[in-house]
Amino acid sequence: MLNPGQTNTRKGEINLPASVNLTGCENLLWKIVNNNGVANFALPTSVNDIAPFIGASGDVIGANTSAEAPSMNENARILLDGTCNPGDKLALSSTNYGRVYAPASGAGSLLVEFIAEEAGVAGQTVLVRRIPARLVTF
């Protein structure tokens, strides 16, 4: 990076302690939470959470875990709740936190950060593309 003011920064995978048990939570969306002044990873707990990280290596509470934050110039895979088609807007699932789903008409206003790049079924790691976060009314 050419900007000398950008010291101690990095791109790509980051490692943080788990604030909850993240064992088996790979390919789910994670968020950063404050744990007594220390950044930790956790699963989202609300459909309006900002959870831009895809879990790469989960572990028990307090152990180091790793996650990636895909940029808008790359695609990624996230566990899907329900079904989707290419081009569907994807929001955080309210029943399986960390997964995404394609909300149906009438679902209300939800935060959307990804679109589907392929058709998918429940439990699949569906190919997605990150988009600028926005509230969408379904």
Give the predicted meaning of each segment.
Residues 1-138:
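Surface-exposed, low-hydrophobicity beta-strand/loop segments enriched in small/polar/acidic residues
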